[in-house]
Amino acid sequence: MSTDTSTVLRLDCEEAIAEQIADLVAETFSSDEAAASTFELKPAERKEGLPGWRVEIFLTASVSEEAVRALVATIAGAEVATAATSTPIEQRDWVAAALEGLAPVRAGRFLVHGAHRRDAVRVNDLAIEIEAALAFGTGHHGSTRGCLLMFDRVTKARHPKQILDLGTGSGILAMAAARLLHRKVEACDIDKDSVLAARGNARHNGVARLVRPVVASGTSHPAIHAGAPYDLVFANILARPLRGLAPSVARVTQRGADIILSGLLARDVPGVLSAYRIQGMALRDRLDLEGWVTLHLRKQ
């Protein structure tokens, strides 16, 4: 999701309608304009007389609420579209917020820290120092730390040589791979601001020669095609884009490749696993952390 995201629309409806709305949003807008997620409300969250499913539609400034409400109305009716609540999303400097109240993040052999906590780095740590960059903080720690921990597990037995980081964000996973494996890592993100931040972080951590992020949607960039076939892929993004990426990931990976996926809630796991199983990728390991799920798959 782009850092230009400014609004989320929420509405409650039946499950089938929720899925139709999410699919229509995905078909109508590009992933850097709008994205939708659906989930079942917990019993305590449900209001009497209202359906038990919710749709959340995240909009960038380039998409008008009116256009999305009109889209919702074609499926759910004008009354439901009008009743959808609109909430502005605060843009945050994730690192600045982290520096205010969060300790360095330790994950296996890795330590992610701000400049103010260089004292936390131990002799054998693979330390990654992150400079400030715009990013959404929701779930960032759980999903990224989960990926680092899973990567730490995988690389105790295997030694990938061709690595891809899809949705690199601040570049933490790509830098971790470069630091540990001393290999070039292809990385991309749909958000140009994230790519600029990731490039800056790579320079700051001395791995700019190995990590050169590009702006790209999925695996579409020539640099990503040139680096294939990969034997390790990271994708720490939302469930719906993860499902959509399954065929592309299959095309750019070699047999026996390890795929580490995160950005998932527990309810998202069956759908994501199904999408990748169809492409010949089987579950090897799972890690649940701070409400987020990280999956390790292997291509058969």
From Swiss-Prot:
Which NCBIfam families does the entry link to? Answer: PRK00517.2-1 (NF001784)
- Identify its protein family: Belongs to the methyltransferase superfamily. PrmA family.
Q: Does the keyword Cytoplasm apply?
A: yes
One example of the protein's molecular function in GO is: protein-lysine N-methyltransferase activity
Q: Could you identify this protein by its name? A: Ribosomal protein L11 methyltransferase
- CDD domains in UniProt: AdoMet_MTases
Q: Which InterPro entries match?
A: Ribosomal_L11_MeTrfase_PrmA, Ribosomal_PrmA_MeTrfase, SAM-dependent_MTases_sf
According to its UniProt record, this protein's enzyme class is: transferase
Q: Which residues bind S-adenosyl-L-methionine?
A: T144, G167, D189, N236
What organism does the record attribute this protein to? Beijerinckia indica subsp. indica (strain ATCC 9039 / DSM 1715 / NCIMB 8712)
**Per the UniProt record, which EC number(s) apply here?**
2.1.1.-
**A single cellular component GO annotation:** cytoplasm
* GO biological process: one example: methylation
Function description? Methylates ribosomal protein L11.
Q: Which ranges does the record mark as transmembrane?
A: none
Q: Which SUPFAM superfamilies match?
A: S-adenosyl-L-methionine-dependent methyltransferases (SSF53335)
Entry coiled-coil feature ranges: none
The alphabetized UniProt keywords are:
Cytoplasm, Methyltransferase, S-adenosyl-L-methionine, Transferase
Record bears the keyword Methyltransferase: yes
Quickly give the catalysed reaction.
L-lysyl-[protein] + 3 S-adenosyl-L-methionine = N(6),N(6),N(6)-trimethyl-L-lysyl-[protein] + 3 S-adenosyl-L-homocysteine + 3 H(+)
Q: Where in the cell is it found?
A: Cytoplasm
